[in-house]
Amino acid sequence: MNGNLDKKNGFLYAKAAVAALCGAFTAAFGWLGWLVLAWAACMALDWLSGSAAAASRGEWSSAAARAGIWHKAGMVVVVCVAALTDLVLNVAVENLPAFGDGVGFDFEGVVLPVVLVWYIFTELGSIAENAAAMGAPVPGWLVRILAQGKEGAEK
């Protein structure tokens, strides 16, 4: 009986710790932090699933894996550019004399979230393609939703 209670308490402590970490992360980084985390997870899963798909076909090579990592590094650069673009736009909106005392609203940024969403949909589409290359059936409607999400972010 006591062992069961300890297992339940351990599970409750683990749930409380996860909830506390998620709350602290949200307090520190807000919804944008979760978007960045989702993008990073998608990048990692895409690289892993791409490597697995290549290995399943007997086509894995360290050169191709390195090229994939460089591709991901380029994406990080683009996300940094988007973040800096939002920062510059925010400073301009709040401080340029042409706007007087600003434009009367807070500019929290739109470039970075749109770039992140576009990359997330791109990565998810690639992950689905990798899964199909490994032999997993991928519903056509899922592929269409991912394509529409990417197109929507491009507009």
Question: Where do the model's predicted regions map?
Answer:
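Membrane-proximal cytosolic segments adjacent to transmembrane helices
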Residues: 1-14, 101-104, 121-155
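Alpha-helical phosphate/pyrophosphate-handling elements in metalloenzyme active cores
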Residues: 11-27
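Hydrophobic alpha-helical transmembrane segments
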Residues: 13, 17, 36, 40, ...
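Transmembrane helix interruption/hinge and helix-loop junction motifs
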Residues: 27-35
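Alpha-helical transmembrane segments of multi-pass membrane proteins
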Residues: 39-49, 75-86, 115-126
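Membrane-helix exit/interface motif
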Residues: 52-59, 80-97
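Juxtamembrane helix-capping/reentrant segments at transmembrane boundaries
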Residues: 57-79
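Hydrophobic alpha-helical transmembrane segments and immediately flanking/interface helices
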Residues: 91-124
